[in-house]
UniProtKB/Swiss-Prot annotation:
Induction description: Induced in high iron conditions.
Compositionally biased region (Low complexity): 383-415, 429-716, 941-959, 983-1043, 1079-1097, 1139-1167, 1175-1194, 1205-1217
Protein's name in the database: Hyphally regulated cell wall protein 3
Glycan attachment sites: 373, 681, 891, 940, 944, 948, 952, 956, 960, 966, 970, 974, 984, 988, 992, 996, 1000, 1010, 1014, 1018, 1022, 1026, 1032, 1046, 1050, 1058, 1062, 1072, 1076, 1080, 1086, 1090, 1094, 1098, 1114, 1118, 1122, 1128, 1132, 1136, 1140, 1150, 1154, 1158, 1172, 1180, 1186, 1225
InterPro entries, A to Z: Cell_wall_rpt (IPR031573), Hyphal-reg_cell_wall_N (IPR021031)
Residue stretches of biased makeup (Gly residues): 960-982, 1062-1078
Pfam families: Hyphal_reg_CWP, Hyr1
Homology family: Belongs to the HYR1/IFF family.
Region feature (Disordered): 383-729, 883-1217
Prosegment location in residue numbers: 1226-1249
Organism of provenance: Candida albicans (strain SC5314 / ATCC MYA-2876) (Yeast)
Membrane topology: Lipid-anchor; GPI-anchor
Reported modifications of this chain: The GPI-anchor is attached to the protein in the endoplasmic reticulum and serves to target the protein to the cell surface. There, the glucosamine-inositol phospholipid moiety is cleaved off and the GPI-modified mannoprotein is covalently attached via its lipidless GPI glycan remnant to the 1,6-beta-glucan of the outer cell wall layer.
Predominant cellular place of this UniProt entry's protein: secreted
Length: 1249
């Protein structure tokens, strides 16, 4: 079994190697071929072009070496390409060019290459028409691209490009370009390459679960390209370049946001665009410089994509400037033209043996072209050589001449004159060969090629010519009946054979289509049609007429002496009837000699008839004697040397354009046939030509065994190279002698630029390298157009006044050429006040404010405000240097409704929280407040509340009130009433004494509700800060959170723990107050404990603290003993302080401050009762008022922003902000705040209380 396998494997290797195809030189195959066996290798420098092969199935490895090319193409609209490789064991390696091109087809194409591995280091092109969806699959387990891959369609369809094995991986380090195509990702993508979408292409990431390397790049190169990514839970970030100008980025679900996340968002710091579909999202790194104003949600409904309504984001602005990665800079090239897909033609030479056993060499043109359906056919036209004995054949090749003003003449000259260069073979596409015998009396050969417009007009002007008797013709009549005229017709395309204007104008005066050779007949009618040329052989000595544009020819000038062997007939177009005309105008011979090796067409010998009156027969005896030689001579095809060409055309405007369109030759028995062309208007040139003809022309005498013809041959040079040469050879039997070798056209290559008119009528400019050989131009290389990119940039412009302005816009760059597409309108500059943070050198962060100017995305700081002056509580001199006066008291816990400040010059409205003042002038003097500021308890709370917690109240109550039960009620109610400074004593007062309630209520407003808020502020500062020094009360309020957070969490434990846990928590006022109230006074036990602790330490007398078991006893005991005098107050204070907290009892001043804070100010006495401190227990009213103010919370601070209006002198807007800081004077006296002056210094306002 193993032996069998080895044998089978060996046989397979032998068969594979045997069937392997190795391309070592350029090869073109058209039509059906089979390549389904063996390995295909294209060597470097070679190419294989397969054209119109419907199915190309590879069954082995494909290896294209560097510099090699494999081209498979279709030129038929009915034929689609099917290119497959279905071997799972073979590979594709491309280091050169692989091109699969069926753009001409109207049917669907199928490119399905499946192998073990795919490696592309060169260029690979997959092209289709897109009329129907096509398949483009490059599938391999190992897939690597380091070069260029182009997927192209003429128009977009639902067909897609698939790369790699599904769920596998591809490595792209090169460039993948899309034209009207969709790339559908089904694999992991690795590498640092680029995928570029051009001309309405799309990139579809259909399986976003498979990772895409963060080094892979996606480039949207035009405004119609897009990118779609599957919306899945695994979010990736894709590098996208070129996003803008209306192209799209999206996901496969509608873009919908879930608050707080919007449907899409752009991070200006990272340049990442996030597109969301609910909880699913994908991110795209589009770069910096985008403005949110230009983003919009759109629908991408392109062919080949899942149509998701409102699933994409478009950016209508230009693409911000961003450097492309190197892989995206690899140029996307157009699909190359396969060799052999353009119609072509070439000349070939065939050597055969004739019936006589002699070799016969034939030359012809091979034309390869297509029909209307794109199918190829080949036409070969053979030109017979002139092998005669006594008879002669003339091959008349008719084709329209090349449209060049430098059309070569029929006679190459050794001088290298451009007018004497041979023409080229591109004038022929097909041929018909016809032989028409001619008789002596008529000219019967016809040419199918129509002459140029100039020739037509010339034939019309000379449409009738009658040749009268000539002695030369009479004597030559013996041989005329044996001649034949062979006309070979070549139909060529109009584009390649139209004569140029220079050639047309040069033959207008000649009878371009008429060639009249005097025959043995007395009269010869001349062809009237431009499409006919008479090639009538005669026995005259080489009656080959020279064509001349000479308008006048005198007989004496044209009758210069010439020998019998040099006689030529000169006919001028100036006459419609010709008599004996033997004037020799030129020694240049005209014969049926092709003007080059690749073209069988000769100079048209147009007989311009000379007026009879100017050319008398008596002056032409030479031609008569020449008839004696007519029986032995043949039409020879001699090319004159430089000395023989004295009558060469003097300019490119000679009648040479007719030499390619019509050929008429009159083989004669003379030993020489010559034709001269001249564009001169005087006969002096004819004289000089006649002189040279008598000395410089060598005649060839033909014999029955000798023939001359033009042929092409190859020569191996000394270096081994093969070159092709053409010339005239003489054959005598089996002997060949080269008479003349044509000078090859000088070939030059150079770079040039030309314009091309496209099918839509637009004109495009192309550049490349062309090769010029004579008047033939061949395009060798067409430069790929410069890649055009558009980007946003900024430039400077010098204005007419010499100033320099900066502008921005979108420019288009093609190579080194820059074109401005859009110039952005300059950004509107605005100035406003703002606040920002600055990181100092030590790492700390400071906040600054000022005026900034914004122009687009550029910010400029105009003014930086100096930081505010902060005044401490008792610094009465603070602010005096800046002219501050009496402050305003604000309260954020109890907002003032519609509070207005009135200026002397304007009215400003302050919002309810007193947070800002608008349209203020630089200095504000506020005269009045429409809503007065309450003074009950305000200000007092900051000092009083700190010492005056739940214990403080119980002591105060027991000492303050004269009635029984005062203490017990005071304790229970004191706890629930907590927090709000100026409403604090409402419940306290009502239960504090028999007379207290009525006064207390009227002074304080509401009852229990006030107490609930009171606790949080009241007790917060009481614990931690209470009792350490005289400043304890005031600091208690200010240190505990600026009033708002003052005492948070303190109230709840205020009654029971009374100071030890006081101020430990944090929280809002309402929660603290409510908790404080419920714990502090909700039960008799709470009150009794409160009383007992207070009582036991409160006084120095006997039984002061014994009433600890019940509220009533405790209160009554406290009341009777405590309320006797001022000593009681001081004892109360000291006792109060000691129980008020672990930190509060160290100083007896704590109690005294508590007393003084409760009513020592005369200002406060006017509202709440005078003499409150020293006469604390003597008056019920005084006690009641004391209760109402007792425990006032700390006044919260408020922030006041001031924005002055533009001043008349500066024209700018400044702004300021200030901190309203609570304050009392050193003696605890509350400042009166009815008038506020806001002074602005360095754009900053400072206000203190």
């Amino acid at each position: 079994m193993h032996l069998f396998k080895r044998i089978a494997l060996t046989l397979w290797l032998i068969i594979s190697s045997t069937l392997a195809v190795v391309i070592t030189e350029d090869r073109v195959d058209r039509g059906t071929i089979s390549v389904n066996l063996g390995e295909v290798t294209v060597n470097s420098g070679a190419s294989w072009s397969i054209i119109n092969n419907a199915v190309t199935a590879f069954a082995g490895k494909i290896n294209v070496q560097s510099g090699g090319g494999l081209y498979i193409s279709s030129t038929s609209p009915l034929l689609a390409l099917q290119v497959t490789l279905t071997s799972l064991l073979d590979s594709i390696t491309n280091d050169g060019v692989i091109s699969l091109d069926s753009r001409a087809s109207l049917t669907a194409s199928n490119y399905n290459l499946i192998g073990l591995s795919f490696t592309n280091n060169g260029e690979m092109y997959l092209a289709a028409s897109g009329v129907l969806p096509s398949t483009m699959d490059l599938t391999a387990a190992s897939w690597t691209n380091n070069g260029l891959i182009v997927a192209y369609q003429n128009q977009r369809s639902s067909g897609v490009l698939n790369l790699g094995t599904p769920l596998g991986a591809i490595t792209n380090n090169g460039q993948i370009c899309l034209y009207n195509q969709v790339y559908q990702q089904q694999t992991r993508i690795e590498g640092s390459g680029c995928i570029t979408a051009n001309k309405n292409s799309a990139i579809y990431i259909s399986n976003a679960v498979l990772p895409v390397a963060t080094t892979q790049n996606f480039y949207l190169q035009d405004s119609k390209s897009s990118m779609i990514v599957q919306a899945v839970s695994s979010t990736q970030t894709f590098n996208v370049y070129g996003f803008g100008n209306g192209n799209k980025i999206g996901i496969t679900l509608p873009a919908v946001g879930i608050p707080p996340n919007p449907a899409y968002s752009y991070d200006v710091d990272t340049g990442i665009l996030t597109v969301r579909a609910g909880l699913l999202s994908q991110k795209f790194n589009i770069g910096l410089g985008y403005y949110s104003l230009f983003f919009s949600v759109v629908t991408d409904n392109g062919a080949g994509l899942p149509s998701t309504i409102l699933g994409s984001i478009s950016y209508s602005g230009p693409v911000p400037s961003r450097n492309l990665p190197a892989s995206c800079k690899i140029a996307c090239k157009p699909v190359p033209t396969a060799p052999g897909t353009n119609p072509t033609e070439y000349t070939t030479t065939i050597t055969t043996t004739n019936s006589a056993g002699n070799p016969l060499t034939e030359t012809g043109v091979v034309d390869i072209s297509t029909d209307s359906n794109g199918s190829w056919f080949t036409t070969t036209s053979i030109f017979p050589t002139t092998s005669q004995s006594s008879s002669s054949e003339t091959v008349a090749s008719s084709s329209q001449p090349d449209s060049s003003s430098t059309e070569p003449s029929a006679f190459p000259s050794s001088t290298g004159d451009s007018s004497a260069e041979p023409s080229i073979t591109s004038d022929y596409s097909s041929s018909e060969l016809s032989v028409v015998p001619s008789s002596a009396s008529e000219s019967a050969s016809e040419s199918s090629a129509e002459p140029s417009s100039a020739s037509e007009s010339a034939s019309e002007s000379g449409s009738e010519s009658v040749a009268s008797e000539t002695s030369a013709s009479e004597s030559a009549s013996e041989q005329s009946s044996t001649s034949e005229s062979v006309s070979s017709e070549f139909a060529s395309s109009d584009s390649s054979s139209e004569p140029s204007s220079a050639s047309e104008s040069s033959v207008e005066s000649s009878s371009a289509s008429e060639f009249v050779v005097p025959s043995s007949a007395t009269e010869t009618s001349v062809s009237e049609s431009a499409s006919e040329s008479s090639a009538e052989p005669s026995s005259a000595s080489e009656s080959v007429a020279s064509e001349s544009a000479v308008s006048e020819t005198s007989a004496s000038e044209s009758a210069a002496p010439s020998s019998a062997s040099e006689t030529s007939v000169s006919e001028s177009a100036a006459s419609s009837s010709a008599s004996e005309s033997f004037a020799s105008e030129s020694s240049v011979e005209s014969s049926a000699v092709p003007s080059s090796a690749s073209e069988f067409s000769t100079s048209e010998s147009v007989a311009s008839e000379t007026p009879a009156s100017e050319t008398p027969a008596s002056e032409t005896p030479a031609s008569e004697s020449a008839s004696e030689q007519s029986s032995t001579s043949e039409s020879s095809a001699e090319i004159s040397s430089a000395s023989e060409s004295s009558a060469e055309p003097s300019s490119a405007k000679s009648a040479i354009s007719e030499s390619a369109s019509e050929f008429s030759a009159a083989p004669s028995s003379a030993s020489q046939s010559s034709a001269s062309q001249s564009s001169t208007n005087e006969s002096s040139s004819q004289q000089s030509s006649a002189e040279s003809s008598s000395t410089g022309t060598s005649s060839v005498s033909a014999s029955a065994a000798t023939s001359e013809y033009t042929a092409t041959w190859t020569t191996t040079n000394s270096d081994g190279s093969v070159s092709t040469e053409s010339g005239i050879i003489s054959q005598s039997g089996s002997s060949f002698t080269t008479i003349t070798t044509f000078v090859p056209d000088a070939t030059s290559e150079y770079t040039t630029t030309w314009t091309t008119t496209n099918s839509d009528g637009s004109v495009s400019t192309e550049s490349g390298i062309v090769s010029q050989s004579g008047s033939s131009f061949t395009t060798i290389t067409t430069f790929a157009p410069d890649a055009t990119s558009e980007y946003t940039t900024t430039w400077t412009t010098t204005n007419s006044d010499g100033s320099v302005s900066t502008e921005s816009g979108v420019v288009s760059q093609s190579g080194t050429s820059l074109t401005t597409i859009t110039t952005f309108a300059p950004d509107v500059t605005s100035e406003y006040t703002t606040t920002w943070t600055t990181t100092n050198s030590d790492g700390s962060v400071s906040t600054e404010s000022g005026i900034v100017s914004q122009s687009g995305s550029s910010f400029t700081t105009i003014t930086t405000f100096e930081p505010p002056v902060v005044c401490k509580r008792d610094d009465v001199n603070c602010g005096s240097s800046i002219g501050l006066s009496t402050p305003y008291y604000g309260n954020s816990s109890q907002p003032l409704s519609s509070t207005k400040m009135t200026d002397t010059s304007a009215t400003q409205t302050v919002d309810s929280s007193l947070s800002s003042i608008t349209d203020a002038t630089t200095t504000q003097s506020v005269n009045s407040l429409e809503t007065p500021v309450p003074t009950s308890g305000s200000g007092n709370g900051s000092n009083n509340g700190s010492d005056n917690g739940s214990n403080n109240g119980s002591n105060n109550g027991s000492n303050n009130g004269s009635g029984s039960g005062n203490g017990s009620n005071n304790g229970s109610n004191n706890g629930s009433g907590s927090g709000n400074g100026f409403n604090n004593g409402s419940d306290n007062g009502s239960n504090n004494g028999s007379g207290n309630a009525s006064n207390n209520g009227s002074a304080s407003g509401s009852g229990s509700d006030n107490g609930s808020d009171n606790g949080s502020d009241n007790g917060s500062d009481n614990g931690s800060n209470n009792g350490s020094n005289t400043d304890n009360g005031s600091n208690s309020g200010s240190d505990s959170g600026n009033g708002i957070d003052n005492g948070s969490g303190n109230g709840s434990s205020d009654g029971s723990d009374n100071g030890t846990t006081n101020g430990s928590g944090s929280g809002g006022e309402s929660n603290n107050g409510s908790g404080n109230g419920s714990d502090n006074g909700s039960s008799p036990d709470n009150g009794s404990n409160n009383g007992s602790n207070n009582g036991s330490n409160n006084g120095s007398g006997d039984g002061i603290g014994t009433g600890s078991n019940s509220d009533t006893d405790n209160g009554s005991g406290n009341g009777s003993n405590n309320g006797s005098g001022s000593v009681n107050g001081s004892a109360n204070g000291s006792g109060n302080g000691s129980n008020n907290g672990s930190n509060s009892g160290s100083n007896s001043d704590n109690g005294s401050n508590n007393s003084s804070g409760n009513g020592s100010s005369s200002d406060l006495g006017s509202v709440s009762g005078t003499g409150n401190g020293s006469n604390e227990g003597s008056s019920n009213e005084s006690g009641a008022n004391n209760g109402s103010n007792n425990g006032a919370g700390a006044l919260p601070a408020a922030t006041l922003s001031v924005v002055p209006s533009p001043s008349a002198d500066s024209g700018s807007t400044s702004s300021a902000s200030a901190m309203v800081i609570p304050n009392t004077n050193g003696s605890g006296k509350l400042l009166n705040g009815k008038v506020l002056t806001l002074s602005v210094l360095s754009s900053m306002v400072v206000v203190f209380l």
